[in-house]
């Protein structure tokens, strides 16, 4: 951002090494080692949370989903699959009721920035194999940044990810961003959300503008209604292909 001053410049003086002289790499300390290598057909229901950009309200929406599902008596595991290490995001899901929680750092990546498609899918699949095997449970996943961000777009474009989605929650900072995001989701990824949330859901004006443009339900993640969340997260209805009001 041109309004933000340049970051502090540092000079690398050396590497941390083992007693044998090998450079320490976080990838050598992977904490996720699934016993299974092939996914069972019946799996935990994936609630995928994505949005227009950073600070659009994704983490709060993901936490609201964890809160609602855990209050309905379901066991929920939660993950953040793309982005840069931010422990508070997965801790907020744990605080909201998620049982097991983790992100890509558990696989040794401090960030998913510039990872190849194969490595991104490996991150997604290993977490899926580790914590989403039980069809009686839910798996809430947040994708960082916006849907056009490289690694997030990479996953949304892949059929292995899209076919896993049980419910898709789309977050936006404002109504206009949500409207544009809905079109991008439909045209680029062939996806239609089951609900809209994020910062815009806290504004009556934004909600009014959205409801005039789209028939997709909107839930306020800052003041979630359990009955409404139940209707959104447990409904067996397939996502409508007609997201926009005529």
Language model: regions and residue ranges:
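Walker A (P-loop) phosphate-binding motif
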Residues: 29-84
């Amino acid at each position: 951002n041109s309004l933000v001053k340049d970051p502090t410049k540092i000079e690398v003086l050396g590497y941390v090494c083992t007693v044998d002289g090998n450079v320490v790499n976080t990838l050598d300390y992977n904490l996720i080692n699934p016993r299974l290598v092939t996914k069972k057909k019946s799996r935990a229901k994936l609630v995928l949370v994505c949005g227009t950009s950073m600070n659009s309200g994704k983490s709060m929406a993901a936490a609201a989903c964890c809160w609602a599902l855990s209050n309905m008596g379901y066991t929920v595991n939660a993950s953040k699959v793309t982005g840069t290490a931010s422990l508070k995001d997965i801790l907020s899901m744990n605080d909201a009721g998620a049982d097991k929680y983790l992100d890509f750092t558990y696989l040794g990546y401090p960030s998913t920035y510039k990872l190849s498609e194969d490595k991104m899918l490996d991150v997604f699949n290993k977490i899926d194999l580790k914590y989403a095997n039980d069809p009686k449970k839910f798996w809430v996943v947040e994708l960082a940044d916006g849907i056009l961000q490289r690694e997030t777009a990479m996953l949304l474009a892949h059929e292995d990810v899209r076919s896993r989605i049980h419910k898709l929650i789309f977050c936006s900072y404002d109504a206009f961003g949500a409207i544009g995001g809905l079109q991008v989701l439909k045209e680029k990824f062939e996806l239609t959300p089951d609900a809209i949330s994020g910062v815009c859901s806290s504004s009556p004006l934004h909600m009014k503008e959205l409801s005039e443009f789209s028939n997709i339900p909107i839930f306020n993640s800052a003041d979630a209604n359990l009955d409404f969340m139940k209707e959104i997260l447990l409904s067996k209805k397939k996502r409508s292909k007609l997201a926009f009001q005529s």
